């Protein structure tokens, strides 16, 4: 569920957020909030991890720097995943693409950590290969079919 879009628009009501926090997050294998969503979920990584989901990937794509840092927490163990920022406006749907790729790698039999790292690599390559493709107006999609 997307709570807050990349453009900063809140897409889920406060009541919807509270329902998600209390009822859905404890059932999830992993949650993948972006930084604005993480700020809604809690004031610290520890607070977010206390919501009942064993794995959290906080996505740092909103950072305004050359190297973007995502934070992956698996059963309390924290790792940073760093990727070079690609200069493109074709970033529409990157969060959904990343979470779908994680699910696909899990379905292929990879463990959680390997699935997250493989999905991160896939997304980075999809963004890079689609950086200069012009599709319509505004933020375009990544290139899902780069291989």
Model regions and ranges:
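A short, structured active-site edge motif that brings together acidic residues
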Residues: 1-3
């Amino acid at each position: 569920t997307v709570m807050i879009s990349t453009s900063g628009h809140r897409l889920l009501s406060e009541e919807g957020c509270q329902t998600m926090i209390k009822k859905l997050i404890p059932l999830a294998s992993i949650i993948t909030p972006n930084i604005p969503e993480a700020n809604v979920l809690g004031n610290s990584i520890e607070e977010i991890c206390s919501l009942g989901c064993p794995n959290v990937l906080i996505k740092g794509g909103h950072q305004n720097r050359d190297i973007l840092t995502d934070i992956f927490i698996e059963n309390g163990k924290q790792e940073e995943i760093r990727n070079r920022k690609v200069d493109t406006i074709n970033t529409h749907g990157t969060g959904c693409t990343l979470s779908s790729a994680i699910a696909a790698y899990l379905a292929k039999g990879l463990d959680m950590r390997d699935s997250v790292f493989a999905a991160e690599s896939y997304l980075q390559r999809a963004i890079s290969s689609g950086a200069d493709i012009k599709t319509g107006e505004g933020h375009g999609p990544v290139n899902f079919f780069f291989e």
